[in-house]
Amino acid sequence: MKKTVLALSLLIGLGATAASYAALPQTVRIGTDTTYAPFSSKDAKGEFIGFDIDLGNEMCKRMQVKCTWVASDFDALIPSLKAKKIDAIISSLSITDKRQQEIAFSDKLYAADSRLIAAKGSPIQPTLESLKGKHVGVLQGSTQEAYANDNWRTKGVDVVAYANQDLIYSDLTAGRLDAALQDEVAASEGFLKQPAGKEYAFAGPSVKDKKYFGDGTGVGLRKDDTELKAAFDKALTELRQDGTYDKMAKKYFDFNVYGD
């Protein structure tokens, strides 16, 4: 009798898992901004590459669904998600109170501190006094744009928003910007450690404000896609527990990108 009950319990458990996966779409369209190396970019062949891409592909594999990546400007990602043009966002998307009013998030993917970069030797610091009269580049729709607009733009700082990060770096190196505010890791790995960024460096400490920058990044999802959120969370927990996350992270970073 006990063996029969155990067998039935196992069958019920397996059936529940199968039903859970069956509720997911066969293909998950994931939106990402491909100008944000090393998280998301394209190689010479036009293939999607980066830490976000690796994470997304691994989670989809464990969820038993097919991932389709969709390139987009950053500020179009949430509108595209809400319009059902994509099913998820994996693009260094910070988990903030404001965004959670519009969409849902998975558990944390990794930390996301923000920091200024400027020419080496520049006295610029992330303070109003230092930035007054200066031109500061930010990514449209980003937490950095929201912070700069509320704290600097109305007080004498020229905050310039761009459709993608590559345009910011281009104007910075051309001298049209005095500084740029963006994700610290993206700035370090995607610009400062590259040939184009050799004459630039971080300007001052990280900019801290939980109201704007939240508690790390997550997968952006529609609020009613509860099964998809649960599946992403389960897959993320598994790959962190079995060491896959750390193995993938070491491909891109020489520090703990997940944070505390």
Curated annotation (Swiss-Prot):
One of its GO terms (biological process) is amino acid transport. Has a bi-lobal structure. Contains two globular domains separated by a deep cleft wherein the ligand-binding site is located. Keywords: Amino-acid transport, Disulfide bond, Periplasm, Signal, Transport. Changing D183A: Shows a drastic decrease in arginine and histidine binding affinity. Pfam families: SBP_bac_3 (PF00497). The 30-fold reduced affinity of the protein for histidine is primarily due to unavailability of one ionic interaction of the histidine side chain with the protein which is present in the other three complexes. One of its GO terms (molecular function) is amino acid binding. The gene is argT. L-arginine binds at D33, S91, S92, S94, R99, T143, D183. NCBIfam families: 3A0103s03R (TIGR01096), PRK15010.1 (NF011586). Belongs to the bacterial solute-binding protein 3 family. This is Lysine/arginine/ornithine-binding periplasmic protein. Its main location: periplasm. The keyword 4Fe-4S does not apply. L-ornithine binds at D33, S91, S92, S94, R99, T143, D183. The complex is composed of two ATP-binding proteins (HisP), two transmembrane proteins (HisM and HisQ) and a solute-binding protein (ArgT). It comes from Salmonella typhimurium (strain LT2 / SGSC1412 / ATCC 700720).
